[in-house]
Curated annotation (Swiss-Prot):
Its main location: membrane. Keywords: Cell inner membrane, Cell membrane, Membrane. The keyword Iron-sulfur does not apply. Belongs to the UPF0161 family. It comes from Leptospira interrogans serogroup Icterohaemorrhagiae serovar Lai (strain 56601). The keyword Cell inner membrane applies. This is Putative membrane protein insertion efficiency factor. It comes from the Bacteria. It is a peripheral membrane protein. Pfam families: YidD. SMART domains: Haemolytic. InterPro entries: Membr_insert_effic_factor_YidD. GO terms for cellular component: plasma membrane.
Length: 74
């Protein structure tokens, strides 16, 4: 399931992202962060991290360097 989601993110980055103005306020970008989360964590934890990140990426946020938290569960 995670591979499928990563492929969807890559498809978004190739097809839709170039058509939109740069808007992500974080480093790495929200799509890169989500792809990393789905590579590192199980489906539900990666989904939780990705949704929380996207909710924080808005005009009221200053944005900053926000790397993926380390996976301590292995």
């Amino acid at each position: 399931m995670n591979r499928f989601v990563i492929q969807l993110i890559q498809l978004y980055k190739r097809l839709l992202s170039p058509l939109l103005p740069p808007a992500c306020r974080f480093t790495p970008t929200c799509s890169e962060y989500a792809a990393q989360a789905f590579q590192e964590y199980g489906f539900f934890r990666a989904l939780q991290l990705s949704i929380w990140r996207i909710l924080r990426c808005n005009p009221l946020s200053r944005g900053f360097d926000d790397p993926l938290p380390p996976n301590t569960k292995g």
